[in-house]
């Protein structure tokens, strides 16, 4: 498991080096990819596959909500609060109740990154989605390997 998390971290770091947006954001983005590995990886291939698609969907929805907020609403604590509630409600309505926290996490990290880096919300959202995809892919591959090699998550 440690190897998978490190693979996600280094892959996330390297992808951020290809598109150098901001040094701090790049490092946090690598950590975001590593954390995503932990979310997606399961001992069984089928469970990892389900987790992969749910994670990608939640990340994309969270990104879209974040971009809409950043482009069209005032940047204020009282402007963000209803958006968080909206994201949680949307996750319930769409049947992603177990991924609502992930949607909100994605929303918040994009808002935070948009305050650190003055790039377009689209760039920040795109990079965060790419980091999630990388981490999710590593977790998915780990699930396939983990099914063949029991005890992978013991390391």
Where are the regions a protein language model picked out?
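Alpha-helical transmembrane segments and their membrane-interface boundaries
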Residues: 1-105, 112-155
């Amino acid at each position: 498991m440690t190897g998978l998390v490190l693979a996600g971290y280094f892959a996330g770091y390297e992808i951020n080096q290809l598109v150098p947006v901001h040094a701090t954001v790049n490092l946090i983005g690598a950590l975001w990819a590593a954390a995503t590995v932990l979310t997606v990886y399961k001992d069984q291939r089928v469970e990892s596959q389900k987790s992969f698609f749910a994670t990608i969907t939640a990340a994309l929805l969270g990104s879209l909500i974040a971009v809409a907020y950043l482009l069209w609403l005032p940047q204020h604590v009282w402007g963000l609060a209803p958006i968080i509630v909206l994201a949680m409600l949307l996750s319930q309505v769409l049947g992603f109740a177990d991924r609502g926290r992930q949607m909100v996490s994605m929303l918040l990290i994009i808002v935070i990154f948009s305050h650190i880096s003055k790039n377009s919300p689209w760039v920040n959202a795109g990079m965060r989605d790419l980091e999630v995809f990388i981490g999710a892919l590593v977790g998915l591959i780990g699930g396939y390997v983990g099914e063949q090699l029991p005890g992978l998550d013991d390391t």
